[in-house]
Amino acid sequence: MNCGPSIDGIAEVNKINRGVNRDIKDFFMKYWPEYGAHGTLFPDSVEYLYESIRYFYEDLKYPFDIKIGLGTVWNEEAANKLEKQLGLLCNYLVKNPKFSIPSVFIKDLSKFGSEAIDDPNFNCLGNQGGAVYDIDGKQYSCETLMPLVHGLKKSIEINNLNRLMREYATDAECRKCPALAICPTCPSMNIKYRGTSNKSATLTTTCKAFKVQLKMSAYLFMLKYEDYIMRGSDVPSFVLDNLEGSTRILSNLSL
């Protein structure tokens, strides 16, 4: 079992996101230095993203990862701020290759433009052997299925299903989107925000941010492997596949 702090960034970020004025990082850095911090990216504090990652990587020298929170609503203004922050991070990460690429970037772009998986055996991650526990000791297969998210009655109802399928959205806008095959659709969030697992919560929440993630992840991949390719070295197949995906993304910026 791993133990690590949930910290969203520098002190200003945690105050905005969670109303936390105390700085808890020193406690975790002292007793669990190897596990690092994990954060959630919210639109209200996105302008601190680059500064937060640089602070953890350089000043604290403490592992830090962050990803966009499920169900957070991103409007055009917030998405534009995200693009600016990711642009700064792209240049920073290329200049500092020793630092790991945070999860706010999409690591596998090779499936962009592919047909959406239509597999009845394709389950969400909540059914892949994971487990979370509420304070009353009750076990759930995923934190998004807990009463804190759905309320007690609905949570029990959903968890009594044999398995919760990840279904590709039936929304017209989603069916024609070339990013559908890699869209971070979560059936639990779909139920919470759209009332059914086969209508996309992403469409009404994180869609604008996800498209910015795609664009800037493609940009980072191109920057990262530009010199590698120019040297004429043998290029691994996964790099070629992702370069192809990156090229398609950057030529379909409107998605």
Predicted segment positions?
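Radical SAM enzyme core and accessory elements
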Residues: 172-255
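Short, small/polar residue-rich loop motifs at catalytic or cofactor-binding pockets
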Residues: 124-128
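Long, K/E/R/D-enriched contiguous segments that form extended
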Residues: 50-120
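C-terminal accessory region of radical SAM enzymes
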Residues: 84-115, 138-185, 189, 193, ...
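Radical SAM/AdoMet-radical enzyme domain recognition
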Residues: 1-76
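Short loop/turn segments at secondary-structure transitions that flank enzyme active sites
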Residues: 9-11, 43, 70-72, 139, ...
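Short, acidic, Ser/Thr-enriched surface-loop or helix-capping motifs
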Residues: 134
